Amino acid sequence: WRESMLYELKSGNLRFAAIYGVGENSNNTVTNKDSGFGIEYKNFLMPGFSIVYARNKDHSVTGANNQNYNEKFTLTKDFKLASGNKIKIWYMHEDVGLDSKLFTGSNSDGEVNWYGIRYKTGPMEFQYSYGDSDANEGPTYDRDGYNIGMYYKLSKTSRIYLAHSKSDAGSGDGANLDIESTLIGLRHDF
């Protein structure tokens, strides 16, 4: 999204943003005329409940049956417990057409359902999410996985991070390559 125009509007609990790519010439359509928009409404119908809809379109995608957009819809609910601890739960449905890493086949199209929870208590925050994918090429191209992580605030300027992620690949790529990674980090602000 280099060389693009962005417009954002905030009014109360409503937030709207739109972006339009203008930087490429007609011979290079990497971002020329690509577009995206998003709408967020906080405290929708009840306190702490938010909805988000977003969509972006890539005009450089060509070929029969290749989807040229990503679209997502998210529901989030925030809770504050009597102890002061906070919990956030969310669900996101994503119609994917532009991300080749979510599925194991050559086609980038499919749908993913994400489920997650975040718990915050004092200086610690813990998060877990699970993604269940459905590749358009068939069930052997799905890639389902989970992410788990936490950070602990050691002081005003230091934090420690721990995370683990695992993604189980379908057998459609011929290699059945699963992905797994672990992160340990220390951050200090000067």
Protein language model regions, located:
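C-terminal closing repeat unit and adjoining cap/tail of repeat-based domains
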Residues: 147-169
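Detector for outer-membrane/organellar transmembrane beta-barrel domains
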Residues: 36-148
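Outer-membrane beta-barrel "beta-signal"
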Residues: 148, 152, 178-190
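Surface-exposed loop and membrane-interface regions of Gram-negative outer-membrane beta-barrel proteins
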Residues: 23-33, 58-63, 172, 176
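A short, acidic, flexible beta-alpha connecting loop/helix-capping segment that sits on the rim
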Residues: 58-61, 96, 164-170, 179
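Outer-envelope exported proteins of Gram-negative bacteria
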Residues: 19, 90, 161-163
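Short loop/turn positions at the edges of beta-strands in beta-sheet-rich folds
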Residues: 1, 43-45, 154
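Surface-exposed coil loops of outer-membrane beta-barrel proteins
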Residues: 1-38
